[in-house]
């Protein structure tokens, strides 16, 4: 991904759009603090639900580096890639997100981001789990993010 930027600004995407995109849709997403990348809810939830850090990617040289794991859900392409790797011969498959994992006593021990399942006549015959990770640097971009939002408030 090529980094689109404003001079001196380390951010590449805010609330799903390049920082130099000010069309109606981009402004709407920023104003409403929305996430266009298949988040579990329409709003961005990165860092804090009421004051989300809507930074999807930052610049590194001439490239953009994804810092939000939800960003990888764009058009669910990641699922097609994972299926071709984990279940290359599957003819019927589906996936579920945010699957709660419990221990032998039924106690919650975590959440799996995505479980891909291969089915045959309504039975699961194979599956694979996917944990999506991205660089997490909320403290390093909170100030540039706030500055951007204040400077380009609508």
What does each model-identified segment do?
Residues 1-105, 109-111:
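Nuclease-adjacent, charged terminal/linker segments that flank catalytic cores
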């Amino acid at each position: 991904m090529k980094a689109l930027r404003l001079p001196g600004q380390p951010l590449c995407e805010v609330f799903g759009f390049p920082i130099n995109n000010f069309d109606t849709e981009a402004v709407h997403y920023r104003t409403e603090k929305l996430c266009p990348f298949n988040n579990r809810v329409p709003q961005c939830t990165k860092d804090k639900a009421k004051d989300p850090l809507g930074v999807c990617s930052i610049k590194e040289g001439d490239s953009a580096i994804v810092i939000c794991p939800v960003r990888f859900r764009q058009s669910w392409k990641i699922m097609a890639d994972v299926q071709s790797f984990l279940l290359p011969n599957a003819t019927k498959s589906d996936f579920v997100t945010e699957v709660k994992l419990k221990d032998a006593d039924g106690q919650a021990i975590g959440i799996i981001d995505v479980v891909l399942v291969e089915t045959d006549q309504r039975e699961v015959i194979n599956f694979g789990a996917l944990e999506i990770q991205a660089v997490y640097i909320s403290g390093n971009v909170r100030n540039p993010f706030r500055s951007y939002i204040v400077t380009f408030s609508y």
